[in-house]
């Protein structure tokens, strides 16, 4: 076979949303450009960082890389979604600006999607790393055991279960999506938390399949001041609770993912209880009673979902 006759790798779009992390960003970008899968476009979405990373990125001299810099902060979710909407590849993946890939990340995951047209998301195991890039062995073992314990390599049909219930697909940086399978314009741009859950919901509602590779091909960095740490305050916990309550309610009401309804109801009530507790801590019993009545009227708390919650607990 002549070189010109070799099959052409389909284009993969890599989106890196970034804000004020120039050093980590450069590490993430280099891990993308070092991929053995060469046919990719890398779109760095800078969300109005104090220091413009464009000169640093341009100096890398790679034509596959382009930078989109917003003149104002448009929010984390909007930054991710607009990047995905700009993508032109057959496949798209979102890498955190502080996360890293093994050089074979794309070469291991994308061919499985090419070979299996029904697969809309391909994902792998991942390591947790600290601020200095050291692997957190205990955390890595715990997360993979909790979400992927016993999961076999190969194609799996139930994205509702793996993406939303067991949360086996729990890190965007460790997953690749078929771009045209995801309805990107359905993602609420003001979503404060749970972007990964929402993308997996959109993948699940296609009724298609996913592929799992148990190799640790991605590294997810845990930082002291990550967005998840905002939930430590009462205000942050209430915002987190309301946001999550809202999207679990969306999932619950969607017939396309009906197999997960008992679990979605539990998660909805779990977050409603979190909102209720925050209101009690902030404003006292009278305000929390009003909140309780409002949540009951909205259907966020029901006896059935509370019974399920008591039986199965948190996941």
Task: Name what the model sees in each region.
Residues 53, 70-87, 97-100:
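Glycine-rich, basic loop-to-helix element that forms the pyrophosphate-binding segment
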Residues 92:
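Short aromatic/hydrophobic "clamp" motif used to bind/position activated sugar donors
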Residues 38, 46-55, 72, 96:
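A conserved acidic beta->alpha catalytic loop
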Residues 1-33:
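N-proximal low-complexity "stem/linker" segments adjacent to membrane-targeting elements
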Residues 50-59, 100, 104:
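Acidic helix N-cap motif at the loop->helix transition within catalytic regions
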Residues 192-195, 205, 216-224, 229-260, ...:
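Catalytic core of nucleotide-sugar-dependent glycosyltransferases
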Residues 104-141:
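Conserved donor NDP-sugar-binding/catalytic core segment of glycosyltransferases
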Residues 147-233:
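Conserved nucleotide-sugar donor-binding catalytic segment
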């Amino acid at each position: 076979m002549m070189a010109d006759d070799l099959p052409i790798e389909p284009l993969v779009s890599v989106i890196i949303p970034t804000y004020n992390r120039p050093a980590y960003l450069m590490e993430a970008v280099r891990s993308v450009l070092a991929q053995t899968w060469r046919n990719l476009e890398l779109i760095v979405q800078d969300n109005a960082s104090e220091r413009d990373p464009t000169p640093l990125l341009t100096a890398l001299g790679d034509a596959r890389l382009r930078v989109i810099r917003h003149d104002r902060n448009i929010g984390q979710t909007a930054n991710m979604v607009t990047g995905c909407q700009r993508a032109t590849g057959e496949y798209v993946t979102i890498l955190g600006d502080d996360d890293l890939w093994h050089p074979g990340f794309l070469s291991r995951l994308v061919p499985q999607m090419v070979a299996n047209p029904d697969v809309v998301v391909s994902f792998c195991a991942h390591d947790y790393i600290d601020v200095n890039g050291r692997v957190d062995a205990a955390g890595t073992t715990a997360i993979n055991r909790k979400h992927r314990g016993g999961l076999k390599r190969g194609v799996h049909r139930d994205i509702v279960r793996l993406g939303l219930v067991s949360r086996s697909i729990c890190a965007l940086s460790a997953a690749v999506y078929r771009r045209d399978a995801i309805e990107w314009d359905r993602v609420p741009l003001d979503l404060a938390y749970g972007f990964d859950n929402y993308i997996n919901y959109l993948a699940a509602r296609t009724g298609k399949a996913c592929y799992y590779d148990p190799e640790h091909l991605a590294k997810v960095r845990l930082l002291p001041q990550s967005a998840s740490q905002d939930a430590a305050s009462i205000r942050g916990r209430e915002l987190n609770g309301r946001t999550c309550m809202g999207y679990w309610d969306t999932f619950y009401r969607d017939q396309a993912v009906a197999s997960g309804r008992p679990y979605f109801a539990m998660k909805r009530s779990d977050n409603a209880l979190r909102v209720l507790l925050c209101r009690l801590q902030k404003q006292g019993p009278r305000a929390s009673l009003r909140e309780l009545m409002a949540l009951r009227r909205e259907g966020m708390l029901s006896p059935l979902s509370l019974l399920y919650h008591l039986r199965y607990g948190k996941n």
